Amino acid sequence: MFRYYKILLILSLVMISSCDSMKSISSKYNILYNGDLFLNEGIDQLRNSYKDNFWDIIPVIVDNNITNSLPEYPTKNFLKSEEKAIKVIQKMGDYRNSASNYINDAYLLLGKSRFYDKRYISSLQAFNYILKQDVKSNIWLEAFYWRTLIYINLQQYELAKSSLEKELEDNKISKRNLSLLYDSMSELHYKKGDYPALIKSLKKAVKHSSSQEQIRRSYFIIAQSFMNLNKNDSASVYFQKSIDTKANNFSDIYLDANLKLSLLKKQELDEDYFNRMLRQPRNLMASSKINYYYALNSYEKGNYNDSEIQLKRSLKKIDDDKNLKVKVYNKLFEVNFDRKDYLSASNYLDS
């Protein structure tokens, strides 16, 4: 009888201990969840304020280029998510097995919080905790991805390249993770301004990507890179690929791909092409840019009067695009200079 009660007592203690452990893990999961909320709120603020500069070649990875998009940086969000991650790490540091995933999640949250707050060295320390482990799990590869971006941002290009090349030799990496690695390699070539290598890398990234939005972006950057290399026939092919991608046709990239293509196919397009674009409600906020490309098309065909009309229409509608305003004034100068109206041309020279 005594033995029976002894067994019951031991089982009860084990159950109580297990319940306490599960409650602790559950509590830390809630902390991580709240930390992710703070992190994502800060990231969303940055993404919503970020705008691609289509007058230059756009970056491959948006999230690696959004940290300067707000004058009032959302540091508070990232500090709060960092605090949540540290709290989990401190309270679960002695747990093993069932808790290890939570520890890794906490270090990943810690690294990302510091990354978006532009504290790259301390972010690197957090990711290295995960990367020192032997098992190449999905979270390991995600930490590797973020570490690579840190190397790129610190201009440690050779270190980023060598580590990526070594990792890409692993034929067991999933398609999704291969896409991340090739995007990282492409971002590296973008930052270095190595456009032939960027084209080559992005073509590989597209083969492994499941995101139609990222595929459209990759095709667009390939086309921009070909234009930069004066390979306009190839650029036309990839602008068309970007347009044909089954992604959101209300995106800025979709519009700009059509406009860039109009430059390369100027003899094939007439005023109806641009008027149709101007009539579409989705292009209402971009009418100044459409008028500008309309003007370029007319100018290339020698229709200087039509070009001037469209340039002046563009000028009336420009909001905060300083690059566009400069281009419009420069083109107005050219139009009047070519017509030998030097007095009118001089009015735009210093505008």
Show where each model-derived region lies.
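Bacterial N-terminal signal peptides that target proteins for export
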Residues: M1-L8
